[in-house]
């Protein structure tokens, strides 16, 4: 197949945030100018809720805890523990390196002091995302972890979101959604502290808002688009499992994309039948069936061709259900998170295995990693130069600076060499 055809085949549904920029910019500007007042007004307009204040009270958190079932509390606690275990293993230990005699360099990892987490409202309460963002932030040593999430029409936040936030160590929770929440965290209001970096998924308005505030005022985790999965399978795959994986992606939202790349025509046919059968039983079948319109089933000649397409597509989630899946996995170079073998559904990583589910979409997996402990830290470099060190590297610095016509740079070394050579 030609490269042009392959590109067409892997084309994603277009996400156009440009057209939203004017609307989004005007909301950001108003929040920046008017603070809480503007946020409360937008909550009334967009979330149809009249709030007297934005902050969630300790009493609300206490009540929420009583409303979450013991079974769900136990599940959330198990997930938290696994996310903690996996992200703690990512801790950076910087060792001192003597690059030359008398020249020592090292790095120190420091948590970003203030981070803002955005948890969307929408059609599902994403308490799992609270864990995915707050747990690594806590391990990283972020001093202030604030969370914004839209309330329902009664002004309440889903109890599981409050429970997960409390469990994971969030410092402050605010009732604010959409663009107004992103603006509040980017610029600060009377209630909401200004943060240094904003994390979390959202619709195209939230994505556009994150893009705009990141241009000059605050860092963001990564550009985000609709969620996506690719299943790479051969004849050994279980068609019911593959169909279940495609549907679990499709129920996220109407713009989600699910794709099957397989070497087996028989599997392709069986998966199509299974998708129909399972879809009929899903409560969110309306959303899932609309999202399946963006989906593709691609038949390839061999695993090499499957991998070529996979690495060109760079899926957010990649499920490898083949006979020798470890060998296939070794050859994956572009993907957000990879799920190996018949018993590893994407849902495991979405919730409780320990890996992070905040991942690059829209082909960004070619250049971006998913959220990890590193997302919440900065590495500061240090260096110390002793007399024998400046004597050794000084002449090289002088020579380089002179050739770049930066005489003051050269002089900063010369003046020191003179002083120690007296």
Segments predicted by a language model, with ranges:
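Long amphipathic alpha-helical segments
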Residues: 14-63
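C-terminal core of ALDH-fold dehydrogenases
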Residues: 312-422
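A glycine- and small/hydrophobic-rich beta-loop-beta segment
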Residues: 252, 260-335
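Conserved NAD(P)+-binding/catalytic subdomain of aldehyde/semialdehyde dehydrogenases
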Residues: 169-257
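N-terminal Rossmann NAD(P)-binding subdomain characteristic of aldehyde/semialdehyde dehydrogenases
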Residues: 49-126
């Amino acid at each position: 197949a030609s490269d042009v055809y392959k590109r067409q085949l892997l084309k994603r549904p277009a996400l156009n945030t440009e057209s939203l920029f004017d609307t989004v910019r005007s909301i950001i500007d108003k929040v920046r100018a008017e603070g809480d007042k503007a946020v409360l007004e937008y909550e009334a307009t967009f979330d149809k809720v009249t709030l007297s204040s934005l902050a969630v009270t300790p009493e609300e958190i206490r009540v929420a805890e009583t409303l979450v079932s013991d079974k769900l509390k136990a599940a959330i606690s198990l997930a938290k523990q696994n996310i903690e275990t996996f992200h703690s293993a990512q801790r950076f230990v910087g060792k001192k390196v003597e690059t030359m005699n008398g020249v020592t360099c090292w790095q120190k990892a420091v948590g970003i002091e203030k981070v803002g987490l955005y948890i969307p409202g929408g059609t599902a309460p994403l308490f799992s995302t609270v864990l995915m963002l707050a747990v690594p932030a806590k391990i990283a040593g972020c001093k202030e972890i604030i969370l914004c999430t839209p309330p329902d029409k009664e002004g309440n936040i889903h109890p599981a979101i409050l429970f997960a936030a409390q469990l994971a160590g969030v410092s402050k929770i605010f009732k604010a959604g959409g663009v107004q929440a992103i603006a509040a965290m980017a610029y600060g209001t009377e209630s909401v502290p200004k943060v240094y970096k904003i994390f979390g998924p959202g619709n195209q308005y939230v994505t556009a808002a994150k893009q705009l505030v990141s241009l000059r005022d605050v860092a963001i985790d990564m550009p985000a688009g609709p969620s996506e999965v690719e299943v790479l399978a051969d004849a050994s795959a279980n068609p019911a499992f593959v169909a279940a994986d495609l549907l679990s992606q499709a129920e996220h939202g109407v713009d989600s994309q699910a794709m099957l790349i397989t070497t087996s025509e028989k599997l392709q046919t069986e998966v199509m039948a299974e998708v129909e059968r399972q879809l009929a039983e899903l409560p969110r079948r309306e959303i899932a069936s609309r999202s399946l319109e963006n989906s593709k089933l691609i038949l390839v000649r061999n695993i090499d061709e499957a991998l070529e397409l996979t690495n060109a597509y760079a899926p957010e989630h990649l499920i490898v259900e083949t006979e020798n899946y470890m060998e296939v996995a070794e050859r994956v170079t572009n993907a957000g998170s990879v799920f190996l073998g018949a018993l590893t559904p994407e849902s495991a990583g979405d919730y409780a295995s320990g890996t992070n589910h905040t991942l690059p979409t829209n082909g960004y997996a070619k250049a971006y990693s998913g959220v990890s402990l590193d997302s919440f830290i900065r590495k500061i470099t240090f260096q110390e130069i002793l007399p024998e060190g400046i004597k050794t590297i000084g002449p090289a610095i002088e020579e380089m600076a002179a050739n770049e016509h930066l005489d003051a740079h050269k002089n900063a070394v010369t003046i020191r060499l003179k002083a120690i050579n007296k």
